[in-house]
From Swiss-Prot, chain A:
The C-terminal Gly is amidated with phosphatidylethanolamine by an activating system similar to that for ubiquitin. One of its GO terms (molecular function) is phosphatidylethanolamine binding. This is Putative autophagy-related protein 8E. Pfam families: ATG8. Keywords: Autophagy, Cytoplasm, Cytoplasmic vesicle, Cytoskeleton, Lipoprotein, Membrane, Microtubule, Protein transport, Transport, Ubl conjugation pathway, Vacuole. InterPro entries: Atg8-like (IPR004241), Ubiquitin-like_domsf (IPR029071). Ubiquitin-like modifier involved in autophagosomes formation. May mediate the delivery of the autophagosomes to the vacuole via the microtubule cytoskeleton. GO terms for biological process: autophagosome assembly; autophagosome maturation; cellular response to nitrogen starvation; mitophagy; protein transport. Belongs to the ATG8 family. It is found in: Cytoplasmic vesicle, Autophagosome membrane; Vacuole membrane; Cytoplasm, Cytoskeleton. It comes from Oryza sativa subsp. japonica. It is a lipid-anchor. Residues 1-14 have a biased composition (Basic and acidic residues).
From Swiss-Prot, chain B:
Cysteine protease that plays a key role in autophagy by mediating both proteolytic activation and delipidation of ATG8 family proteins. The protease activity is required for proteolytic activation of ATG8 family proteins: cleaves the C-terminal amino acid of ATG8 proteins to reveal a C-terminal glycine. Exposure of the glycine at the C-terminus is essential for ATG8 proteins conjugation to phosphatidylethanolamine (PE) and insertion to membranes, which is necessary for autophagy. In addition to the protease activity, also mediates delipidation of PE-conjugated ATG8 proteins. Residues 1-15 have a biased composition (Polar residues). The gene is ATG4B. This is Cysteine protease ATG4B. GO terms for biological process: aggrephagy; autophagosome assembly; mitophagy; piecemeal microautophagy of the nucleus; protein processing; protein transport. InterPro entries: Papain-like_cys_pep_sf (IPR038765), Peptidase_C54 (IPR005078), Peptidase_C54_cat (IPR046792). Its main location: cytoplasm. Belongs to the peptidase C54 family. GO terms for cellular component: cytoplasm. GO terms for molecular function: cysteine-type endopeptidase activity; protein-phosphatidylethanolamide deconjugating activity. It comes from Oryza sativa subsp. japonica (Rice). The lineage of its organism: Eukaryota, Viridiplantae, Streptophyta, Embryophyta, Tracheophyta.
Amino acid sequence: MEERRKEKGKEGRRGKATGHSVDKFSRSNLPEMEKRKLHLPPGTALFVFVNNTLPQTAQLMGSVYESYKDEGDGFLYLCYSSEKTFG
Amino acid sequence: MTSLPDRGVSSSSSDPLCEGNIAPCSSSSEQKEDCSLKQSKTSILSCVFNSPFNIFEAHQDSSANKSPKSSSGSYDWSRVLRRIVCSGSMWRFLGTSKVLTSSDVWFLGKCYKLSSEESSSDSDSESGHATFLEDFSSRIWITYRRGFDAISDSKYTSDVNWGCMVRSSQMLVAQALIFHHLGRSWRRPLEKPYNPEYIGILHMFGDSEACAFSIHNLLQAGNSYGLAAGSWVGPYAMCRAWQTLVRTNREQHEVVDGNESFPMALYVVSGDEDGERGGAPVVCIDVAAQLCCDFNKGQSTWSPILLLVPLVLGLDKINPRYIPLLKETFTFPQSLGILGGKPGTSTYIAGVQDDRALYLDPHEVQMAVDIAADNIEADTSSYHCSTVRDLALDLIDPSLAIGFYCRDKDDFDDFCSRATELVDKANGAPLFTVVQSVQPSKQMYNQDDVLGISGDGNINVEDLDASGETGEEEWQIL
């Protein structure tokens, strides 16, 4: 049951919680991510996706988890993305 | 990408590439759809189609009738198409093409009703098209240029093949300045002398360090966000570069002459520099008020404000649920359009029709021109384009930035109420949200009662044994 609360990312930048996060943070807003931990240099964009949409910053983790947890494995999958460039 | 010769550029330093031409792109855009990724970013196809189809015969500069140099023999097929275009009624051709259908066009907050092609002789219909095209071609068009002074220490005297995001952002900010100084209903006059405000705006976007918002100065200001001559850049970094440049200019001008170079507050709607939550951006009314207050040097009155909202709306491609919301932003009277386009190809998207974006394309190469700040007789034709280009909204890259200009407090309030309505239509996934004030981050630990949260009865309290862990350890990168 512990695993269901892991968070996992894809798209090159992966994030995971060490279990318990959704319980502990269920009344918290989305966690503040530090760019250096995602190997993003300062000054780059950071966007977090749940179910391929941007979660509302004021949403509580508990409700995000309940809405979007994976039905199969109980994980809440978060994806992190920076931005594309144009020329 | 291969670097192509600067096709479509005449030796004239003010080549009116698109002047007076309309929408032969109805076919070119289709072509581009198929092969744009393989094509050079200099939009050779669009140049090919820049032969002078004069819709506004009476309004033409004589220069618009020059033959373009781009119709080389290798593009004979284009002449066939051109003949097709020329032989039929232009309106009928447009009406059956995908560039302009009979549906309503929303263009920078203004709606144009275009009738169907059957009524091509109908004066109302034509005026619908004509008034739209007059509006479209009055927007400031900023493109790749070559032949300018080298950018700082680099050897770059041209931004061909790398400057499109910078150019797109210049177009958006130029529109903000046009709206501010001249109003949304301003149209480019048919005759000189021009408005001093209009010339003054064009001067600011000239290609030299002496011009406030030149590519030279933007790259320098955006250095810490990865902007550099020759490098591609994303919309978020571009917005931050503008923020830095405007701040720097403001400080310098206060020291030098006390004048404002940028006549409005600038709000880049995004999180902090280092730590961000990364969700949908939040327009905070208190932050906007503070920025206006700072702009007014401490007086607590409102000021005009430019909002830039950088976004990423999907991982690999744009999530289609955002498209109706993006379209709706063009109905806001505050709309300044969008920086973005197909992957790798930034444009200035200024309008929408059906499921297609209408844009101004920076991927044309023109010679740099110097428009003196007070030269109201200047040739400004290279800063306008009558060629309406389009692309399917679902093909745009998820990385983009939306702009809004709010003239005063009432206008800002109107923007906020429209944005809030749009949140309600978003079915849980808005582009951005509006709040009154910044809430301190909620980091409450649920030591006792996770079941108190409605709907979370499935969370197992027994696993709550790690309360000693710090927040940092809770969020590891896989």
